[in-house]
């Protein structure tokens, strides 16, 4: 059996959570120029003839709403640290003091003046820096989640592309085999006409042709569904036209599960986000404990007495946490519970990621064996069986039922081989996501 056409390399992005965030800002073209944005919005026709994963990925990174939303959440979080670390806004006030109700006494009495004042609240040293740290940790966590969103969308795109390519590949197989079956029907009919065959052989071939037509109808419906799912990820109308995809090809994946676990601990944006959640919660606990300390208020006033000598006054106040047992104490309890929650979430996330890696690695291993089995043994043997049965039928040593059965077996095994290729590629994509890797960013993977 001839090898399938080669799909262009699934170009990836340099790994690591920090890199994901950086690429999200620039290299992944999440902020295209106006001309590029116009191309993205008006670019539906560019996929009408053919589609490949590399172009689809670029389009997705520029247009997918999940990525855009994650990016904006990150940018919003980046704007908070400066706000949290700034002093409260000062208060400016004014007032007029008069000595009596009968007349205005400013300028004629020391007890009459116009006052201008300013007041500034100053939190206890360390509070503002802790507030800024908490906000910065949250911004970092949102950045990690932004990287996770990129990974998730790219993986969903690849899985949806594999589904779309599988349906197209299946349609090609069934249509090709439909032509072959029509030839078998013609051969059976020719033998029947000269009295060397049976009418039931012709009828069996026609029944099998009807079955293939039904299969084509089902596959066409699946093609429309797969195209709609792919368009959804691309942020295009569900019925937007999509051309012929590249055929699914076999990839080699040599990483062990232990190696992938080590990679995940360093690069997984979900694990990074969980750790930053712990850091944020611990900083929040430090801030809650700092609330036991008083804040200060600085004040300055100027008294204008018109023709008399003006006066000024400065002062300071302390905001005492008098009801600490009802307020600050419970704030510390709340923050401590938040730390426990964040640590538990980190542990749960770690367990989920590592378990997912083990499970997906087992799926990849099993799927690769099936691909090798079908591609290297089952399908070639089925082809030989059909060729042998066809030759035997021509000379009368094999009946038509045996020939038709050989054809049916080959058709099913070719379809199954395509399904196993798609299942293998999807499992590899999901495993890369779990380990925090983008496509083609795995050193142990190479094209065959």
Say what each PLM segment does.
Residues 2-10, 148-265, 363, 367, ...:
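Periplasmic alpha-helical coiled-coil/stalk elements that build and connect Gram-negative outer-membrane
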Residues 2-10, 29-45, 416-448:
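Acidic, low-complexity, intrinsically disordered peripheral segments
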Residues 17-31:
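Bacterial N-terminal signal peptides
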Residues 42-49, 93-131, 243-257, 286, ...:
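Small/polar, glycine/serine/threonine/aspartate-rich low-complexity segments that form flexible
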Residues 57-61, 197, 201-202, 206, ...:
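Amphipathic alpha-helical coiled-coil scaffold segments and their short linker/junction regions
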Residues 58-68, 75-90, 105-108, 116-133, ...:
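A glycine-/polar-enriched beta->alpha junction
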Residues 60, 118, 164, 230, ...:
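Hydrophobic/aromatic residues within transmembrane alpha-helices of membrane transport systems
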Residues 69-81, 149, 153-174, 183, ...:
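Amphipathic alpha-helical coiled-coil segments
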């Amino acid at each position: 059996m001839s090898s399938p056409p080669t799909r262009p390399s699934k170009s990836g992005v340099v790994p690591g959570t920090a890199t994901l965030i950086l690429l999200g800002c620039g290299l992944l073209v999440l902020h295209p120029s106006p001309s590029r944005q116009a191309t993205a919005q008006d670019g539906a026709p560019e996929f009408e003839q053919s589609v490949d994963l590399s172009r689809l990925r670029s389009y997705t990174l520029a247009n997918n709403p999940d990525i855009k939303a994650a990016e904006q959440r990150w940018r919003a979080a980046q704007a908070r640290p400066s706000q949290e670390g700034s002093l409260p806004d000062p208060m400016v006030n004014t007032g007029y003091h008069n000595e009596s109700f009968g007349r205005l006494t400013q300028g004629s009495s020391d007890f009459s003046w116009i006052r201008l004042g300013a007041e500034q609240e100053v939190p206890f040293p360390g509070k503002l820096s802790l507030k800024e740290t908490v906000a910065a940790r949250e911004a970092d966590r949102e950045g990690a989640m932004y990287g996770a969103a990129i990974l998730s969308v790219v993986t969903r795109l690849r899985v949806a592309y594999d589904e779309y390519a599988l349906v197209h590949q299946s349609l090609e197989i069934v249509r090709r085999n439909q032509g072959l079956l029509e030839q078998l029907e013609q051969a059976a009919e020719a033998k029947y006409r000269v009295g060397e065959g049976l009418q039931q052989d012709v009828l069996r071939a026609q029944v099998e042709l009807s079955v293939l037509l039904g299969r084509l109808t089902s596959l066409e419906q699946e093609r429309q569904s797969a195209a709609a799912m792919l368009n959804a990820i691309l942020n295009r109308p569900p019925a937007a036209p999509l051309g012929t995809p590249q055929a699914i090809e076999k990839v080699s994946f040599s990483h062990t599960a232990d190696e992938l676990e080590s990679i995940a601990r360093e690069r997984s944006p979900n694990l990074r986000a969980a750790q930053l959640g712990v850091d944020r919660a611990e900083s929040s606990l430090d801030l809650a404990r700092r609330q036991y300390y008083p804040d200060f208020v600085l004040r300055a006033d100027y008294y204008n007495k018109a023709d008399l000598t003006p006066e000024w006054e400065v002062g300071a106040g302390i905001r005492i946490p008098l009801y600490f047992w009802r307020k600050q104490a419970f704030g510390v309890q709340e923050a401590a519970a938040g730390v426990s929650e964040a640590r538990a979430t980190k542990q749960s996330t770690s367990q989920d990621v590592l378990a997912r890696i083990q499970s997906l690695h087992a799926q990849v291993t099993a799927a690769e064996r099936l691909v090798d089995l079908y591609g290297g043994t089952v399908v070639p043997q089925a082809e030989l069986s059909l060729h042998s049965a066809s030759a035997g039928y021509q000379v009368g040593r094999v009946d038509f039922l045996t020939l038709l059965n050989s054809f049916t077996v080959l058709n099913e095994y070719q379809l199954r081989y395509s399904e196993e290729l798609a299942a293998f590629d999807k499992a590899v994509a999901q495993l890369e996501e779990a380990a925090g890797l983008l496509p083609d960013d795995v050193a142990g993977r190479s094209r065959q």
